Amino acid sequence: MAPATAVVTPQTAFKTDLPVEKTAHNTVVKSEMGALSKAYPTYSLDESFSFAPIRESTVSRAMTRRYFSDLDKYAESDIVIVGAGSAGLTAAYYIGTRRPDLKIAIIEASVAPGGGAWLGGQLFSAMVVRKPADLFLNEIGVPYEDEGDYVVVKHAALFTSTVMARTLALPNVKLFNATAVEDLIVKEGKDGKQRIAGVVTNWTLVSLNHGLQSCMDPNTINAHLVVSATGHDGPFGAFCVKRLASAQLVSNLHDMRPLDMNRAEDLIVKGTREVFPGMIVGGMELSEFDGANRMGPTFGGMMFSGIKAAQEALAIFDERKAVNEKYL
């Protein structure tokens, strides 16, 4: 008989199996120490129920005012992250928590962020994460089963929804989803050197249908650094490295190699770096750039590549900002 699997619940994870005590107006959950930890409201949904009144234009203004305020605020960002998959979201969380003074804009082409991290692989639910990437699960509060050299999150969506919630709750992070990066801003400074200075954006539906309509010009976001984690080759995948290559700013891409889990995850993490001044590449996009192996349905490499990208960004940000302000 196989030994029982240890289930690890980080201290920041939510408890759902605690004893309850009902009062007249609330259901109160007791903590393991017996103290009252959370009071749930009573939902009175009888025939007298009604929502607070609202006018349709109020809803429209509530959305548009905030969105256009965000567009104005993040038109000059400190760091832009392209791609809100497991690597991109992890990078945004790491930078946002370690440097709350920085403005971080995330650009995601899909309506739904998360990339390929909503399922473990081939429509299966569980997510396998090789150690020591369980450290990040502990930090954000995702419970898992400890299997020795690896851990298993019961559903990949539990990780993705958690890292997304933790990241988007940060006051210095803004996600622009359903928004595609169509090009890069590349500037030659007074020192004669070229640098990435931001991204060119458009609504994804526009980007997908340029051939079916009259021209619609894009928008722009300036940034001192761009972190690209757009995944492997696809309609929007590996976009930034493909654009660097087509603009002859880097040599030709080497294309992703066949699957080798042990080799792939180590190489992705170790190889995450600034590939062109102002452009850091991580995640599966890096495998298209370097010609590294794919790793398949194991996600520790994506998480730690995101952290490595964030560490690289934080290590050079102040220098890049100073150089840009001096020469651009």
UniProtKB/Swiss-Prot annotation:
SUPFAM superfamilies per the UniProt record, alphabetical: FAD/NAD(P)-binding domain
Main localization, broad class: cytoplasm
Gene Ontology molecular-function annotations: cysteine-dependent adenosine diphosphate thiazole synthase activity; iron ion binding
Catalytic activity reported: [ADP-thiazole synthase]-L-cysteine + glycine + NAD(+) = [ADP-thiazole synthase]-dehydroalanine + ADP-5-ethyl-4-methylthiazole-2-carboxylate + nicotinamide + 3 H2O + 2 H(+)
Biological role: Involved in biosynthesis of the thiamine precursor thiazole. Catalyzes the conversion of NAD and glycine to adenosine diphosphate 5-(2-hydroxyethyl)-4-methylthiazole-2-carboxylic acid (ADT), an adenylated thiazole intermediate. The reaction includes an iron-dependent sulfide transfer from a conserved cysteine residue of the protein to a thiazole intermediate. The enzyme can only undergo a single turnover, which suggests it is a suicide enzyme. May have additional roles in adaptation to various stress conditions and in DNA damage tolerance.
Inducing stimuli: Repressed by thiamine.
Gene: thi2
Cell location: Cytoplasm; Nucleus
Family: Belongs to the THI4 family.
Modified residues (2,3-didehydroalanine (Cys)): C215
Cofactor: Fe cation
EC number(s) on file: 2.4.2.60
Binding positions (substrate): A87, E108, A109, G116, V181, D217, H232, M284, R294, M295, G296
NCBIfam families associated with the record: sulfide-dependent adenosine diphosphate thiazole synthase
Organism lineage: Eukaryota, Fungi, Dikarya, Ascomycota, Taphrinomycotina
Family annotation (PANTHER family): THIAMINE THIAZOLE SYNTHASE
Broad class of enzyme this protein falls into: transferase
Post-translational modification: During the catalytic reaction, a sulfide is transferred from Cys-215 to a reaction intermediate, generating a dehydroalanine residue.
Cofactor note: Binds 1 Fe cation per subunit.
InterPro entries in UniProt: FAD/NAD-bd_sf (IPR036188), Sti35 (IPR027495), Thi4_fam (IPR002922)
GO BP, sorted A to Z: thiamine biosynthetic process; thiazole biosynthetic process
Gene3D superfamilies reported for this sequence: 6.10.250.2840, FAD/NAD(P)-binding domain
GO cellular component, as recorded: cytosol; nucleus
Name recorded for this polypeptide: Thiamine thiazole synthase
UniProt KW keywords: Cytoplasm, Iron, Metal-binding, NAD, Nucleus, Thiamine biosynthesis, Transferase
Quaternary structure note: Homooctamer.
Domain of life: Eukaryota
Xref: Pfam families: Thi4
